[in-house]
């Protein structure tokens, strides 16, 4: 036996306690950031999802697509804007977001996963009443600000997702959803992932980002925290960069609504999901109740 082979065996053996803990459990993964634009990282993420599925864990993927939406808006000559970390969504922007999220980003991820076998099924928040949206405003510099057709999740109907899980599939969810009157909204993928994780009674919520985790005093690299509770995080929230706010709000929502832990991890690292779930050290920042 070579040293490399022995090392691989040791890695697998070390993962056993975590495999036992997560067997049969649902893990919701919010897929976004650089992990969606680098071909190597995309392939690694898809392989991670298939690995989880074949280890008896039930992954549910909720994906973003902000970079791809911005690129398409630019290509079409449609202006785009962000306020409070959320995209301002006019009806014209919504049409583009709907097309890109399900027709481009979602289909690509489904294809990458299904290169390993017939596992992934793509759905949107519109399918089987998965999400019911309610229009939201955001607070910018202390002022409530209208950001257009942007929704929060008012209700989650998990039946379709649970049916897919029971059939051995990996749901891949695009976050477009109607409100109670049928008006379609764009839901921030972080927000949707948190709501879905809570509704599914998931064991964990993983949030892929483009940084190593949560910094309490950015840009001080020494302020990276490995674990933080919801009380501490609530106090920290007003000091965070706008782009991090939806992610941290999502972690808070998931954990306060019953998900045992939420994890902010670095999606720029290959197999970051497996490192977080199946090693003692993990990666990034873990959010728990006090």
Curated annotation (Swiss-Prot):
Q: Which reaction does it catalyse?
A: N-acetyl-L-glutamate + ATP = N-acetyl-L-glutamyl 5-phosphate + ADP
Q: Name a Pfam family for this protein.
A: AA_kinase
* GO molecular-function terms, A-Z: acetylglutamate kinase activity; ATP binding
Predominant subcellular localization, coarse grouping: cytoplasm
InterPro entries associated with the record: AceGlu_kinase-like_sf (IPR036393), AcgluKinase_fam (IPR004662), ArgB (IPR037528), Asp/Glu/Uridylate_kinase (IPR001048), Glu/AcGlu_kinase (IPR001057), NAGK-C (IPR041727)
Q: Which class of enzymes does this protein belong to?
A: transferase
Name this protein carries in UniProt: Acetylglutamate kinase
**What organism does the record attribute this protein to?**
Mycobacterium sp. (strain KMS)
What gene codes for this chain? argB
């Amino acid at each position: 036996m070579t040293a490399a082979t022995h090392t691989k065996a040791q890695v697998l053996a070390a993962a056993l306690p975590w495999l036992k803990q997560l067997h049969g459990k649902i893990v919701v993964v919010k897929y976004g950031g650089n992990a969606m634009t680098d071909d190597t990282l995309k392939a690694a993420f898809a392989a991670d999802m298939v690995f989880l599925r074949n280890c008896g864990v039930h992954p549910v993927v909720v994906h973003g697509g902000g970079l791809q939406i911005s690129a398409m808006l630019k290509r079409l000559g449609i202006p785009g804007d962000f306020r409070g970390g959320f995209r301002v969504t006019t009806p014209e922007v919504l049409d583009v977001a709907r097309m890109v999220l399900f027709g481009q980003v979602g289909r690509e991820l489904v294809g990458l996963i299904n290169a390993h076998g017939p596992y992934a099924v793509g759905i949107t928040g519109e399918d089987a009443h998965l999400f019911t949206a309610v229009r939201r405003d955001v607070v910018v510099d202390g002022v409530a600000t209208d950001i257009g057709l942007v929704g929060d999740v008012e209700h989650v109907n998990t039946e379709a997702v649970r049916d897919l899980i029971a059939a051995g599939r990996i749901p891949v969810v695009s976050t477009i959803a109607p409100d109670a009157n049928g008006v379609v909204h764009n839901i921030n993928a972080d927000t949707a992932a948190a709501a879905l994780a809570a509704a599914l009674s998931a064991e964990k919520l993983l949030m892929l980002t483009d940084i190593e985790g949560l910094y309490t005093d950015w840009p001080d690299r020494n302020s990276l925290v490995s674990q933080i509770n919801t009380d501490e995080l609530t106090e920290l929230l007003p000091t965070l960069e706008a782009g991090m706010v939806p992610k941290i709000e999502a972690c808070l929502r998931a954990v306060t609504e019953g998900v045992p832990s939420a994890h902010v991890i670095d999606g720029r690292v290959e197999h970051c999901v497996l490192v977080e779930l199946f090693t003692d050290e993990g990666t990034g920042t873990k959010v728990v109740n006090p």
